[in-house]
Amino acid sequence: LKSAQEHLAVAIQEVRRISHHMHPQILDELGLSEAIESIASDFSKRTKVPVQVNKPALRKLLPDFINTTLFRIVQEALTNIQKHAKAKSVLIALSVESDWLTLIIQDDGVGFEIARTQSKGIGLRNLAERVEHHRGKFTIKSSKMGTKITVKIPTASFVNHFNESTIHSDKNDNNNER
């Protein structure tokens, strides 16, 4: 019985770890815009590569499943930039227009051969699958001048959660989003 309890405790810890990994706590604490700002700041401190973040204040605009997808894409892209790009600067731009939510992550690094990478790693494939799950478009353009990831998710995929009146410019709204 004691062994079963120990195994159950380990299993519960693993479920907790997985669930925290699936939905980052930082999203609940800060909201998407500030969570992106936070991981960009951490990236800059760690790598000494400046990151410019352009974003609207998305106060209760996007559902958790979209926030998690976008956050994970930024997280994975920054990891790839740190490991491979040799970039001197990074741009992260998030915007919401009438029909599309768009996320752009761009660096000025050394670039890579997309076809060669797709067969080796699962990171980029996982990102594309996350976006396609929301009926979105995931594109990567890379050259010796850098790499640009563009994610477009139709607002129709979260239309029941979308309320354009909740979009505020960061310049007009300095409060933390919740």
Task: Describe the residue ranges of each PLM region.
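Coiled-coil dimerization/phosphotransfer module
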Residues: 1-178
